[in-house]
């Protein structure tokens, strides 16, 4: 199995994929500092066109996905306030085995979200 980190975003308020969500992948380094590894935007299926991280760049450690959902909700008219309740959703996770597929989906609505380790 080739290791990689992937995600997808579903908008549970309308039951559709969330297109146009900016997703950042950060590595948490010594002292708790964050290092931006990559940034991508979800496509019409709410998925990314390629993995955020692949086997040759994977390393054991702590990572954080940051989903820029506030801009998505504003752009699509789901909220009508300058400062949406959910703006950036951070999901911090541990990566132990560089040969595994780490899929971290986000189910989101303007008032809440959930995530899980997918396959």
UniProtKB/Swiss-Prot annotation:
Catalytic activity: 5-hydroxyisourate + H2O = 5-hydroxy-2-oxo-4-ureido-2,5-dihydro-1H-imidazole-5-carboxylate + H(+)
GO BP annotations listed: purine nucleobase metabolic process; urate catabolic process
Highest taxon in the source lineage: Bacteria
EC number assigned by the record: 3.5.2.17
Associated pathway: Purine metabolism; urate degradation; (S)-allantoin from urate: step 2/3
Residues holding substrate: 8, 47, 116
Key words, A-Z: Hydrolase, Purine metabolism
Enzyme's top EC category: hydrolase
Gene Ontology MF terms: hydroxyisourate hydrolase activity
Subunit-level organization: Homotetramer.
Function: Catalyzes the hydrolysis of 5-hydroxyisourate (HIU) to 2-oxo-4-hydroxy-4-carboxy-5-ureidoimidazoline (OHCU).
Family designation: Belongs to the transthyretin family. 5-hydroxyisourate hydrolase subfamily.
Other notes: HIU hydrolysis also occurs spontaneously, but more slowly.
Protein name: 5-hydroxyisourate hydrolase
């Amino acid at each position: 199995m080739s290791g990689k980190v992937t995600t997808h975003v579903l908008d549970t308020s309308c039951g559709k994929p969330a297109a146009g969500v900016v997703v950042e992948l950060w590595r948490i380094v010594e002292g708790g500092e964050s290092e931006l590894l990559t940034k991508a935007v979800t496509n019409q299926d709410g998925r990314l066109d390629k993995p955020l991280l692949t086997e040759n760049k994977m390393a054991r450690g702590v990572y954080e996905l940051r989903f820029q959902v506030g801009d998505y909700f504003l752009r699509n008219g789901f909220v009508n306030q300058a400062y949406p309740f959910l703006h950036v959703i951070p999901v911090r996770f541990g990566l132990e085995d560089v040969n595994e597929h780490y899929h971290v989906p986000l189910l989101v609505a303007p008032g809440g979200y959930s995530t899980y380790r997918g396959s």
